[in-house]
Amino acid sequence: YEEPYANGTTPNPFYDANDGNPSYLLLNDGHGNFTDATAAAGLEKKRGRRSYSASFADLDGDGDLDLLVVSDFAGVDLYRNDGHGRFTDVTREWVADPHAFGMAHTLADFNRDGRLDLLMIGMTSPAVNRLEHLGLTRPDSTEDRTMRSRMTFGNRLYMSRPGGGFEQTPLSDSIARSGWSWGCSAADFDNDGFPDVYIANGLESNQSVRDYEAEYWLHDQYIANATNHPAAGLYFKTKFTRTRGREYSYGGYEKNRLYLNQGGKSFLEAAYLFGVAIEEDCRNVIAEDLDGDGRVDLVVTTLEIWPKKKQTLRVYKNLLTGSGGNWIAFHFPDHANGKSPIGATVKVHYASHTAIQQIIAGDSYRSQRASSIHFGLGAADRIEKAEIKWPDGQTESIQKTVINASNEIKTPKDKSLGH
């Protein structure tokens, strides 16, 4: 990630920037040696994105791992894997609008239809809202004016379509405007069978609530572009010294959000009631059942600049009682039999429902979670079937599952397991 304003530059264009430090796809030969395969894999064109998160995941259900990349000043890019390690950019085929100040992502089956959905975390902007409402823009601007509001739509929830690809539905609107957002995690915190979402918020909360954010939209983006500009660099340095000397905030005082999934039809924001509406600026989020009691806990980091610069790690134990939801979990060993569990898909069939999850790395914001999967089952007291599809195409049924417990999974050896 290349920081905006460095050397008097700003990402250009602000809605499709591809002018940052390069990303790499490195192939491991099994002996600790890596080869740059970015261009050979078809990933050269957009490698200059200012990316924050990326995951290999089976997005189209064909058994191989596709690639999704979420970037600031761009949004989401989606690549289909042809099964031989060659990727094709299918962003425009799979989503109608990929644009956002992309910060993170998470994958979950939010409407319990047996397909993985994608939540991209973006940002909203009170300044843009005011400008759009008043119909104000620079008369000399050559940018597409619609991109201001599209880029500041906020979070975009893409629901998986039966025929492939994704679409935004009204469910996306109920989770879109969480603030200046960072890490996120989807987990069934109340075990009702529908994944909820926790989102970290806030950039710089300073002593003053006066916010710098409007300056970008009114001035900064018109002064510089992606080319090094010493005069612009001096201007920005002087400006930041002045505004920070006056202790301006920048995307400050935005509490974290907890969105409870209401049966796949809407989300209800309840962070304050659950005691996790953290006001300090936060970054990383991981959701994990740390104590094995069947209730998913939270791990959150803060990055604070006032009244004292500090970083903290906070662990929030889930104490929710009375929900009555049953659950089942599966834990995968790391690299047993020489295999990585990343990309393994688990389907659980119960009470006429099919729930799905994948072992995924690289989601949230600069975070890594354990190789485990947790399903809330609601009132169901048994599951009819559980099955795993491994990244190499092998499938197996999980025998002797126990609900309200974590079930250990053995990674298969390199031989057919049958179907």
Predicted regions and their residues:
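Blade-edge motifs of beta-propeller repeat domains
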Residues: Y1-R49, R80-A100, E132-G179, A214-E279, ...
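Extended catalytic-interface subdomain
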Residues: F110, L116-T124, M151, N155-S160, ...
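Short, solvent-exposed loop/turn and secondary-structure capping segments
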Residues: Y5, Y79, N129-H133, S208-D211, ...
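Beta-propeller blade termini
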Residues: L27, S51-G61, R80, G102-R112, ...
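Short glycine/acidic-enriched loop and turn motifs that connect beta-strands
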Residues: A74, T124-A127, E204-N206, E304-P307
